[in-house]
Regions:
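Active-site hotspot residues in diverse enzymes, especially metal/ion-binding acidic/histidine motifs
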Residues: 1-58, 63-163
Length: 163
């Protein structure tokens, strides 16, 4: 079962209905394309999402809204709404990537964003957004188990070895 299928199963287990080919943007050129939308236990994914990785990344964030958001948060001028949006995204990043995912990519020998994204079955854009979010959350670096994960100046992982 791939990550997207796991997310669909989790949604089903939590009684969240997922509409996988919804026309969220119409035929018009839109300034800000909407890839997914959560409302009252329902998730709509845009029909133009091409890959399983794209669908999984969007679904993870929309499930984040199910678990962390309440009310209508469409208006991003509201600080409260922006905080809820950030929480939903962070939930998705932790679900799809997480610090252990970054370590897993390091252990697998991934050398660049493309390889990390492929290893984690996500898009490169999603990875970059996650790193930016983690940089804001953790600062220059964070430690977990025997590893140091640097976010500034670039993503890097080091393993602490006792001598």
């Amino acid at each position: 079962m791939n990550k997207y299928e796991e997310l669909l199963q989790d949604a089903s287990d939590d009684n969240v209905r997922v509409y996988e080919s919804f026309d969220l943007n119409g035929d018009n050129e839109v300034v800000e394309k909407i890839d997914g939308l959560y409302m009252d236990g329902n998730i709509a994914l845009d029909k133009d999402l091409k890959t399983t990785a794209e669908r999984a990344c969007v679904l993870a964030e929309e499930l984040g809204h199910h678990y962390t958001s309440n009310g209508n948060i469409i208006d991003m001028n509201s600080l409260h709404n922006r905080k809820q949006e950030r929480q939903a995204r962070l939930h998705g990043y932790n679900r799809m990537i997480g610090l252990y995912g970054i370590i897993s990519a390091f252990k697998a020998g991934c050398q660049n964003a493309f390889e990390i994204a492929e290893h984690l079955h996500i898009t490169e854009d999603y990875l970059q957004e996650c790193i930016k979010c983690y940089r804001e959350k953790y600062g220059v670096y964070t430690t977990i188990d025997n590893y140091v994960i640097y976010f500034i100046p670039n993503l890097a992982v080091g393993e602490h070895i006792d001598i």
